[in-house]
A protein has these predicted regions:
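Divalent-metal coordination cores built from histidine and acidic residues
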Residues: 72-77, 81-86, 92-190, 212, ...
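Histidine-centered catalytic micro-motifs
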Residues: 81-91, 195, 222-228
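Bacterial N-terminal signal peptides that target proteins for export
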Residues: 1-7
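Histidine-rich, glycine-flanked metal-binding segment
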Residues: 22-28, 35, 39-80
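Alpha-helix-loop-beta-strand connector modules within alpha/beta enzyme cores
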Residues: 142, 205-224, 247
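C-terminal motif of bacterial Sec signal peptides marking the signal peptidase cleavage site
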Residues: 15-18
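Polyanionic/metal-chelating signatures
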Residues: 120-127, 131-138, 143, 154-166, ...
Length: 337
């Protein structure tokens, strides 16, 4: 009987040991912070565990054996933010730490609003820089943030037409589509346009549709600073929706807004049209500023007819009396809209 009792005791003890779970291990555990997990749900206090540079747990409080523990009590924890419209390419080439973005929580910088770092120069020339090579330059320099880029629609136009304000020929469109295909194969996210700046606004709707049809074949998307953001914003939105439909491509509106107080009421109609297009099956999204002001450079105020031919032609044109008179009239008219 004693032997049976002893064996039973051992068995129960082993069973209890078997039921106990080991505390999982990780390299870094973050405890006590309010977690905003990116789903849109309410934040919650919990635990995040990281192992081998991968997040292995996000959830309610849980114990981990960790090499490093971060107490985030009183702080917010969120996935890295995406800078959807970054002009940091040049700065990153000079200083890849990206401190200005990292200190604001940005971990991905996306380039390509209208123009992109490549392609530049003539294909075959020693100084030619392809889209892929431009992005590889940053990757090889080991910049701190992740980087991605759209192919600038204006960059494609400059490659084949320059700064002329005219419609692309059929031959030029074919060449432009080849450029898009090459860039998409090199990792472009799609086509980015900025249609209030020269030479981007020299492109008509047909040209933009042609470029986006190629991007669509590679699973790309179209993102656009629309052609107008004031009293003609609805026409500009119609153009974006048409491009999305004809090219069968998802489209996003850069920094959706209506500029100048007389046009603020139009934003309700813009949003309603976007929702209607989405209900129809078009894949339309938008991003917005988190503040109530916008800014731009001189190129956003100077009419694009002045800028035709590039900077040197622009400067020379502004030195002439008649163009200067017309310029002042057009600027005043634009700012009054």
């Amino acid at each position: 009987m004693k032997l049976k009792h002893y064996i039973l005791t051992i068995a129960v003890f082993l069973c209890i040991l078997g039921c106990q779970t080991e505390t999982p291990s990780c390299d870094t555990v973050i405890q006590g912070g309010m977690i905003y997990d990116g789903t849109g749900e309410q934040p919650f206090e919990g635990t995040i565990a990281i192992k081998d540079d991968k997040i292995i747990y996000v959830g309610k409080h849980k114990e981990f054996e960790a090499t490093s523990t971060i107490d985030a009590t009183g702080k917010a924890i969120a996935p890295g933010f995406i800078n959807m419209l970054s002009w940091g390419y040049g700065n990153l080439k000079n200083d890849g730490r990206s401190l200005s973005d990292l200190k604001q929580g940005v971990t991905l910088e996306v380039f390509g609003e209208g123009t992109s770092a490549g392609p530049k120069g003539k294909s075959g020339d020693e100084k030619y820089l392809s889209f892929g090579a431009a992005m590889d330059t940053l990757e090889k320099s080991k910049v701190s943030t992740n980087v991605a880029s759209f192919l600038g629609a204006a960059t494609v136009r400059i490659q084949h037409i320059g700064y002329a304000n005219r419609k692309a020929t059929k031959e030029e469109l074919v060449a432009m589509q080849i450029t898009v295909e090459k860039a998409m194969k090199e990792g472009a996210m799609g086509i980015g346009s900025s249609l209030i700046y020269a030479p981007g606004d020299y492109a008509d709707t047909d040209e933009l549709v042609a470029l986006n049809k190629i991007a669509s074949k590679f699973g790309g998307m179209y993102i656009s600073h629309m052609r107008n953001e004031d009293n003609k914003v609805l026409d500009a939105l119609d153009e974006l929706l048409l491009i999305a439909e004809k090219a069968n491509i998802p489209a996003e509106i850069y920094h959706l807004k209506t500029s100048r107080k007389p046009n603020w009421h139009l934003l309700d109609t813009v949003i309603a049209k976007v929702e209607k297009a989405r209900a129809k099956g078009l894949r339309i999204t938008a991003d917005m500023y988190t503040y109530n002001a916008s800014s731009t450079g001189l190129t956003g105020v100077i009419p694009t007819w002045v800028q035709e031919g590039g900077h040197r032609a622009w400067i020379n044109r502004m030195k002439q009396a008649e163009p200067r008179k017309r310029l002042l009239v057009d600027i005043r008219k634009e700012l009054a809209q």
